[in-house]
């Protein structure tokens, strides 16, 4: 596909397609062309594509003619602008309406306009019609802003990447067969819609996304649905090319998006129809099954460690066909309701054709699921609050009043005689609270400081309402005038409250909470309730008790939101027959945990549970107190309570009253109100852990008590007896997965499971929970999907162009967007897109974003990152220095390890290329022979790209001048907050004096709790908005770095380059080659597939794995456990006295006996490779997390040369730690080469092992001097 407009990109296109060598000159020429390309040029290039007829689709004309917004809004009795609901209670999203009548033209871009200032002015004065118009215009603009950058940039990068020839795969030795852009239906659609909207106007872009906001094309055909529609079309267009999606499925996805734009509300339609693709593919597969293989995993004991073992492959046969009830009726009804009957019919027919579980069938499911809309859904904050925070659960069997004792302060205790199922909830929480409070660790000053510090962050926390509540009782707070920090942070709050007694700060526990918003993909937007510091403080007993339950009493997982942090093998195990899984979710979980049932029982259980262990003790700065005890009717006594119980009393008062939610809706002028709600706050430290503990406790009560009491079916009873929450029910928050282990007899019958599920639903209704249960032969947990042991990446949940922009703050200044661009690349790696196409597209995208116009002083400059910066950040090159194309894998690490790895693969080629191009040196270097590599690397800007990539991409704000006295007051206040317990301070002082004796001079700036107040202060500074000067300083630093001439890489990378490897035999496959383990990672996607089968999949929880590689699992916020760990390891490596390690541990707050014992253990213990490598900042790359990197380090990197020992490769006896570093270097080289990960053998260490070790030791001693 050739285009006359794109000819200037010719050499760049050839270089990213592997035809010619990549070079920085070609890259920068292309970057200039990208930045010179106007929006109209992009549309002209689209005009040149001769699309095939089958890439076209009927575009409903109704998407261009939409009614006015007037009839969709009204002002309610409380004077709030509200959305009229026509299609259902939740029809409160942006209506698809015309917008041109509300716009005034832009001064210079006359074809574009934004909301008329006259309307905004009338809205401020309270005019109802103007308020309605402003609300509609602003929320439509917000919907259009949910993108990372203008869509044209992503389209242009696609046009450039796809202008190259078909890609040749050197591993499969064939050209790939993904159809070119002439078959791309979403791209055709994008072009036609833009063409139609712009009509006769000279400008073609339907809207402009600029830093000043969104500007709409002044066209009568422009509607609020066009931006989200275009955003979805661009996502689909890119995915079709880079993931090799089936064009006929993508066309169905396009039709659904067009229907959404033709409907009354795009986001609402998307939300209602998001199940179309998964329901008719993933959840309907294999009604007939005639073959295939699934993995056979064993879950090792204890199950809570989440370790699995691969036992081979299980052949699949008809007996494992889908037996779960059919969803056909539901699917057909959905199709009829939303006009999608044809699509659903076609999908179901195609799904039935797959009767074998293999690479093709799982790729089909993945392709179909990728076609779901991937926009971030928005609605006004007013509607979000009134949707999410007005539900109250219907409790069918409430706890009878007579089952409670009289009040003890704010709580009542549940009597032993109660017959309510609440007694089991009470018992679990009581037991956990008693055990938690009896642990000495709970009372340790460091542990309390960690708890007090965990919510001291640069995020907001309803500070204004807190200050108002304290002013109301005449408590004045220091205002730290003139301090250049962001006041709306919990760091600032902690400093203000540090020296106030609890009797004052406790007033703020009942203060209003402010409002945060989160927009999500394929889920309703959520409002966040950021609690203030005193509210978080009294939540601690709730958090600690829930943590105890989750750690000791159930099978919960903790994970972040990234795919790599979740326990993937759990889903593989759960979905592999004969095991079966049931996905159990609690609908509206926050709203279902209220004082009426849960919180009243839990608060009483904690209050009574901690009583015996906490007598008279304060906790986390909350003193002991006295309450009225009227638990025995007619008797009133004063009862002393401990600090922990005092917290529970205050928390109970808050939970009982509910939260007062202050809504200030920036999208709707005049929508400013306070809303009382009993819904559990989503911003509490207790939220997730609390829900998890309740989720498992209620399930345990069902399996052991309620279930058996409500059925006499012997099969159901036998099934319930075989299940426990310690072995079969995994949960996190409101998400649960019930795993029914396969027996020697095979699967449990579908009817038996159905009967149990009906019981669970009925059980939940008793206490107000609505269990949302899916039993369909697949496993879904934490938004990961599995079928027959194969993960199905949901590509639509990682939108390429979309970005959550929940508030109206301006977008982040360049070059911060480069982190997002690299994030797009890594998402694609985790999701298993077609590796060559994805690298090519991302190379094009990175080039498009690599250049920026800026003002430095009075002159215009262009800032340009060389291509090497992107290589340093992890984007693998395609072809360099005369190498073959496509020899670098996307598993190449980032940073120094990645640079070392690719250079190691082609070092002889680089030397030859440099010499051939005239870079010859008089002196021979051990690394590049007789090549004058320093001159070469400066000429090709390799050094400059390397050093620019290491510079910060956000302006530095912590250097601002501040009045010295105020700054010292502020850091002193933070220090008082942290060191509230004098014992903690004396430990750190003791550590410091010991350090002077035994540690001084060994390493610089050892981590200490005394650093934390200053780090918090810096954090509060960094949260502020950057000034123009700070932006200019950052640009200036980048420019200077680009102009500088360098003589070497960093000391670490120079040391790494002394090590050479020999790549040898391929290893045996770790898994059966016929097993689909991740849809899309299959023989058609050569490199990821060969890595997966040669290295093997990760078979344990990565989080648990890394937790075991730390000496200290937790520390106060502001210190980093990895930094403490590497300081301790460096001390050990540098031969420090054990007393220096003890001093270091005292400085981070451990008590002396504990510090001494841990120091002794560190001195003697055999330390894991991953942990030891931290001494030189090496860490496992994210892209390896789904692979078994641990066994690769242990078994496939050989430190004994293939032909026997050499003097140069021997490692001195006292430098055993070098082995860990060498294993990382070897693994980096093996993973960076495409194809099977081979066994690597150490070949040579230039200068020998001792000299290398000494280089690292010198580096360790110097590290931290500059900090």
UniProtKB/Swiss-Prot annotation:
**Substrates-to-products reaction catalysed:** RNA(n) + a ribonucleoside 5'-triphosphate = RNA(n+1) + diphosphate
Q: Which residues form the RdRp catalytic domain?
A: 555-792
Is Nucleotidyltransferase set as a keyword in this record?
A: yes
Query: What functional role does this protein have?
Result: RNA-directed RNA polymerase that is involved in transcription and genome replication. Following infection, it catalyzes the synthesis of fully conservative plus strands. After core assembly, which consists in recruitment of one capped plus-strand for each genomic segments and polymerase complexes, the polymerase switches mode and catalyzes the synthesis of complementary minus-strands.
Q: What is this protein called?
A: RNA-directed RNA polymerase lambda-3
Family, as annotated: Belongs to the reoviridae RNA-directed RNA polymerase family.
Q: What is its EC number?
A: 2.7.7.48
Top-level taxon of origin: Viruses
What GO terms in the biological process aspect are recorded for it? Answer: viral genome replication
This protein's gene is called L1
The record's annotation in InterPro entries points to:
DNA/RNA_pol_sf (IPR043502), RdRP_5 (IPR012915), RNA-dir_pol_reovirus (IPR007097)
Any GO molecular function:
nucleotide binding
**Keyword annotations:** Capsid protein, Nucleotide-binding, Nucleotidyltransferase, RNA-directed RNA polymerase, Transferase, Viral RNA replication, Virion
Entry's Gene Ontology cellular component terms: viral nucleocapsid
Cellular compartment(s): Virion
Keyword Nucleotide-binding set for record: yes
